[in-house]
Each structure stands twice: as structure tokens, then as C-alpha cells.
Amino acid sequence: HWLELEKSLGKKGRMMSIQEADKQSANPNFAKGKEFTINCQTCSPAYVLREWGFNVTAKGNTKGSLSEWISHGRSFEVWENLDGTKVAPVFQKDWLSSHGYKQMTEKRWAEYFEETCKEEGTYILTIGWKGGGGHATILKRTKEGLFYIEPQCYDEAVGAKRPISELCKDGGSVVRGSRGILRVDDKKFLEKFLSIFEKGS
């Protein structure tokens, strides 16, 4: 599927490390305007494509843009399985129900992350915060364990691999239907959404 992306994005380079794909490089304009502070739904796939070796960055989330459309609970709609079938995220509401839980707690968030992200790979998470509002971000399972990667805004003090405990503490107890986790390193990014990225030189 990379060959199709190369037609639009140019030839991909070598696969990037976590640090190269992250470190504010997926969203370099974060400090330049509000639209780059509310574009998490674009930063997350930008990070994934960067891991694959494509030099892309996230465009801002402006009114009427494709990024705005994705931000309304559609983060998983930009992906499909390699055989062209629809993806199946592990939605938080379904996970709670299958465990007989009514709502999330700090401990249950950790359980959900660990259970859903068992295999080594890159995952997109959509989550609601305790104080309201939502976020799309990256979970990464490596040989060392499970990490939280924040492609929208890099924190030099914390580094690229952040502890998932940050998300467990801040995750809201009530979950919304469209929020969940999807493994994406083994998926196809749909070409019709490529305009949400800026192409690097």
C-alpha cells in the first residue's frame, strides 16, 4: 500500500525512529496558531506516516476543513484493512460492557490499554478527558513495554516515550461511543484523506 501513497507523497525514505517521527516534527507549527493546538486528529496519522518514512506534517484544524470533519469522532475512518475491508477498533464502551464494568477508573484505563495493545505495533487512541474534551494520540508497544507518544505537542522534559499512567490519570470515567483504540501500523491510510498533511521537501 506504500506504493499508492508514494504517488501522492513522493518516494518514502527509510522508516523513522520514534524520536524522528515525534519530537514536534509531526506538528512543527504547534506554537503558531490555535488551529495547530486542536489538530490532534491529524497529528496522530502524521506520526504514523512519518514512522513509515513519509516526510509529512499535520495541517491545522480550520473551520470546514477535512481535519475538522475527522475531529468529530471519525479518527478511525481514515484507515482500512490491507484487503480493503472496514477496520474494527476496540471501542471503550464495548470493552467496558464485555468486562461487566459501568465506567472507567484509573486502574481500568491501564487494563484497557494493556489488553488492547498486546502486540508490538503502533495504535491510535481516542480518549475523553476528566475535565471534558477529547483527544487523539498514539500508543506504542515495543519490546520494552507500552508507551504513550504525543505527536501534537512534544515535551522535552518527558521525552518521546511517555508513561501510559498520564492517560490513565486524566482519562474520563464516562466513555463516548466513537472512542477507542485501533492498531494502525498494519493498516492502510486512505488516499482521499492525504490532503490533511503538508508534504515535506
Annotate each predicted stretch with a short phrase.
Residues H1-E119, T126, K130, I181-D185, ...:
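Glycine-rich short-loop/terminal segments
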Residues T122-P151:
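Catalytic nucleophile-His microenvironment captured as a short glycine-rich beta-strand/loop
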Residues A110, G133-T137, R176-G177:
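Short small/polar-residue motifs
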Residues V158-S201:
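Noncatalytic regulatory segments and standalone regulatory/sensor domains
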